Amino acid sequence: MAKKGFGGGMMPGGGNMNNLLKQAQKMQENMQKAQQELESKEVEASVGGGAVTVKVNGKKEVIDITIKPEVVDPDDIEMLQDLVLSAVNQALRNIDDIQASQMSKVTGGMNIPGLF
């Protein structure tokens, strides 16, 4: 009597493996779509009462920095550097938060390492 090889018949549960594969493919498509949408987003962060504003896109590229002329003090460059650094870091945190929220919606709250 010949033995059936692995997978030589219906999976227990009536083909749940096919459904699982379809769900995984759909999730992958949704993640790619969400990633494309995220890359087109732009986020701003302002510090120092609006003295410095930084805009980043979903690719985490700084696309604009606005500095009010009144904060440019040649005798205190360090303060301006701190404001720019703070604004850049805040803008990056903002885009990270948006990305995490968007991916959580796509993955149904599953934490999948390395998505972004």
From Swiss-Prot:
Keywords: Cytoplasm, DNA-binding. Its main location: cytoplasm. It is found in: Cytoplasm, Nucleoid. Pfam families: YbaB_DNA_bd (PF02575). GO terms for cellular component: bacterial nucleoid; cytosol. GO terms for molecular function: DNA binding. Disulfide bonds: none annotated. The keyword Transport does not apply. Binds to DNA and alters its conformation. May be involved in regulation of gene expression, nucleoid organization and DNA protection. Belongs to the YbaB/EbfC family. Homodimer. This is Nucleoid-associated protein CD630_00170. It comes from Clostridioides difficile (strain 630).
